Regions:
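Glycine-rich phosphate-binding loops of nucleotide-dependent enzymes
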Residues: 2-255
Length: 255
């Protein structure tokens, strides 16, 4: 991204468990309005890296910065505008979309005891609907719908909406299209593109390479805890990406 300051930046980040080096000297930058995909084989370090990016796990060494300020915890990262959606989504299925969106705020501030008690239902629905409209998410038309009645794709979108209710700098997604059918995958990818178009920085982990190539601006390939390639997604194929992931043709992969 030309002449832009990064929204989220990692500087020489390492993570070590005893003698095992999960991450080694990772440097990356994410910019407003772009979609970055972290790709790598199982055990490459993707989940560890994303947990460090969202503040859920401290690095052994190195810095994690949001708009130039170092973060030191999950709560601090959230306050700085970093939203995270894990693969299991962690939605309360007996609650509505709106209640889940506000529950995310309350669990971060007052804990379960204060959850949802500070706002009446009508106001909650109104504000949740306004946020959905602002984000341009057309697939969640009724925020009063219980999560248990949503499709798999709609649940993923509801989790994204919850993360973005209070975090507006960057969104991190762990396997957002896992176990979804083609129609639901399309719904989620369109939501991701809509969010990025509004200026959000988005980073995702995915094994679904065709979906990644359909939505990502940049690819970062991890191997054994190191980013070995950073390159535009445009022009890449499933075959070329897999070759980079396993280490074939390293001399030409980044050309």
């Amino acid at each position: 991204m030309p002449n832009a300051d990064p929204v989220l930046e990692l500087r020489n980040v390492t993570k070590q468990y005893g003698q095992i080096k999960a991450l080694q000297g990772v440097n990356l930058q994410m910019f407003a309005g772009e979609i970055v995909a972290l790709l790598g084989d199982n055990g490459a370090g993707k989940s560890t890296l994303m947990n460090i990016m969202c503040g859920a796990m401290p690095p052994t060494s190195g810095e994690v910065l949001v708009r130039g300020s170092q973060i030191n915890s999950l709560h601090h990262a959230q306050e700085m505008g970093i939203g995270m959606v894990y693969q299991d989504l962690a939605l309360a299925h007996h609650l509505t979309v709106a209640e889940n969106m506000f529950l995310g705020r309350e669990l971060r501030s007052d804990g379960l005891a204060g959850a949802l008690g500070w706002l009446d239902s009508a106001e909650m629905v109104r504000r949740a609907a306004e946020e959905i409209a602002h984000l341009g998410i057309s697939t969640l038309r009724d925020v009063r719908m219980p999560v248990r009645l949503l499709s798999g794709g709609q649940r993923q979108v509801a989790a994204i909406a919850r993360a973005l209710m209070w975090s507006k700098a960057a969104l991190l997604l762990d396997e957002p299209t896992a176990a979804l059918g083609p129609k639901q995958v399309g719904l989620v990818l369109e939501t991701i593109k809509t969010i990025a178009a509004k200026g959000m920085s988005v980073c995702l982990i995915a094994h679904d390479i065709p979906s990644v190539l359909a939505v990502a601006d940049r690819l970062m390939i991890l191997r054994r805890g190191t980013i070995v390639h950073t390159l535009p997604a445009a022009g890449q194929t499933v075959t070329s990406v897999v070759s980079m992931m396993v280490g074939e043709n390293d001399d030409v992969a980044a050309a």
